[in-house]
């Protein structure tokens, strides 16, 4: 049996905002150099800065985050983070980003850990506030993430766009690279279809428990770390968001982000 421990932090005035502001929140950005489709992508130049710096700066703009740390096992990435004045921790080599985060979180004194992917240079700081809000509303929430409605048909069949189905209480039922749910009878019309926005927040204790658990068959089959939590019975609160995610997975993705950030409205 997995037992998750948590601490209830009373709000100073009883509001969700006050409760969140009373929590010590650390944002961790896992970054690795190796990538089958785009090696070295954290250091890829985007508008004169490495991608990891764009992510770091945007996360640092969140007023609820006390500290931002890049977690990497690569000295080249660590050196570049030091050069732009960021905080970085060198870790052991890990199979997953969750395990990398847990190594760093074990050394931290904080309430919540926010996991921001190192290949999301367009991350909006407002998304962090949305992911953290459920912890103030419900002390039983251990892990949160975000999702939004699919608007482009191509996203449904793209395996790099992870789909999610959510129960009536707002908890994730399943994540998949395949289209879910399956529409057996087209005459009934499609229900709302949602994609996962890959930002997570954890109570520190929950992250440590999750990292201690064995990888699971579905996690390996889909190559989705969040399925480890679901298979072990850890519920993930899913929050619908207006913010989108744009992970850089391919050279084509990188060129698109470069165009967006080179435009005046997209300047970082």
Segments predicted by a language model, with ranges:
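Short, high-confidence coil segments that cap the C-terminus of an alpha-helix
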Residues: 65, 110, 138-141, 234
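A conserved hydrophobic position in a structured secondary element of the catalytic/binding core
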Residues: 72-73, 123, 202, 249
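Conserved alpha/beta core of the MobA/IspD/sugar-nucleotide pyrophosphorylase nucleotidyltransferase superfamily
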Residues: 18, 189-268
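Short phosphate-binding loop-to-helix
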Residues: 69, 75-133
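Conserved core of the sugar-phosphate nucleotidyltransferase
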Residues: 125-216
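N-terminal amphipathic/basic-hydrophobic helices that include classical n-h-c signal peptides
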Residues: 1-19
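N-terminal glycine-rich phosphate-binding loop and ensuing alpha1 helix
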Residues: 22-71
